[in-house]
Amino acid sequence: MRTFRGLAAAFLLAVAPGAWAQLDNAATPVPLPIPIAAASTAMPAQDLDALRAVHAREINDLSTFRTAGLPREAIDSYLDSGPGQQFLRELRAADPAASADTIYARAVEQLASGSTLPALQPMAAALVKIVPHGQNVSPYSPYFTTSAQLQLASGRCATLADCFGLPLKSEAPLYDVYQIMPKGTVNVFVSQVAPTEELGGLVRRKGGAQQYLLPNRSLWSAPVLIGTIKN
């Protein structure tokens, strides 16, 4: 069963009612948007544990992780478009000292994580990200989603890892949910998470969740922990 435990009352007002969560030191439960969903029907935990034991090095260095996302030709065509040029401008603004080759490589990596061309949208609302319980959000990670999309994924996928195409290194029984806020109205690039595979196909994820690419994280607030959710 998945639950979402809230940690900061200030953020509860930003999300719609759903499953039950409880503030630390609070006496009564508070509704949050992550619903209760069925237990995972994906690969049994003992099988995943065995894979982790045998392939610890490959899992840790992500050397076998592959994304079946956009091909290079589609990415190059997108980068020549208006939205693609905006994507590149925001990458350059995030790291003005980076070379053109570095900016291009980052663009390819981020865009290839999706199976669809990103739609450029203005955004003035919060976004969220899940990380294994106890870990922090990288200050450079561009991959986020909305609380509504997290709710949708938790209801229709065997695991959140499956819907979001996570590598084994990033999969956990329990995730911390972090929220960021835009500093005004900013651009986001919305695409569908591509299928992924790892360890030569021993582990496959179907993807399909909606992701929000943020090529310039300096336009957003620092992440704030707002709760937890089960895989």
Where do the PLM segments sit?
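Bacterial N-terminal signal peptides that target proteins for export
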Residues: M1-A8
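Short, solvent-exposed coil/turn linker segments
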Residues: T3, P44-D47, E58-D61, T146, ...
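Catalytic toxin/effector domains delivered as secreted proteins or via bacterial secretion systems
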Residues: E90-N231
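Long, low-complexity, intrinsically disordered regions
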Residues: A21-G134, S141
